[in-house]
Amino acid sequence: MTQPSSNKLTLLDWLDTQEDNMVTLLRDLVNIDSNSFDKAGVDRVADRLGEFFDEQSIPFETIPIATHGDGMRAVVAGGNGNRPILLCGHRDTVFPTGEVEKRPFEVRDGKAYGPGVADMKPGLVINAFILAAFNKFGGHPNPLVGLFTGDEEIGSPTSQDVIIAEAKKARLAFNSEPGRPSGNIVTKRKGGIFCHCDIYGVAAHSGGFF
């Protein structure tokens, strides 16, 4: 078995010291209402991530989107021209605006609670700290690209093209959605479909004779 290099050990040691900072970032993200149709809220999540990237000296750009949350792309260079590794995540949630006021972020008995605390604001924190760690210590053989979109919960109608374009350039991609209760991770999906169904029938009562 190949032993990790010393810089990787340093990287992991640093991550071990960042738990409080991770929880702080998670708290800040969860305490922003960011329903898929709340563009202002979804973009405020990007603003908070942008503050983190500025603190870590990680360059990022905004991809303007008119109707839903803007796209956000952060890059940690390296890899001598190798194809990048893509770290994906979405900033929107299914919860209505105002949900944060009802149940803001809190930690009870070692568990975090709040809107988006599973799907998927912790995943944004994971990706952000992965980028920060490799930006700080290096050792990555490929460039790293963090892509943070704003409309996944409604099928990514405005960010789909952005995701596809980044995925085509990447060597591989990790999407930091939550795993299963067993600890297993999901490696593929069957896909999804939106459809409109017209149902025709005859009105009746179950107790009637028809």
Model-derived regions, located:
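Acidic/His- and Gly-rich active-site-bordering loop/insert found
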Residues: T2-P115, N135-H140
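Buried hydrophobic positions in well-ordered alpha/beta secondary-structure cores of metabolic enzymes
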Residues: D33, A74, L87-H90, N127, ...
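Conserved strand-to-helix beginnings and helix N-cap segments that scaffold or border functional pockets
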Residues: V42, E99, L124, S156-Q160, ...
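Fold-independent oxyanion-binding glycine-rich loops
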Residues: G89-R91, D109, V117, T149-D151, ...
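Glycine/serine-rich anion-binding loops at beta->alpha junctions
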Residues: F95, K111-I126, H205
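Small-molecule pocket liners
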Residues: R103, I193-H196
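Acidic/histidine-rich catalytic neighborhood of metal-dependent amide-processing enzymes
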Residues: M120-F194
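Acidic-enriched catalytic cores of C-N bond-cleaving enzymes acting on peptides and small amides
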Residues: T187, S206-F210
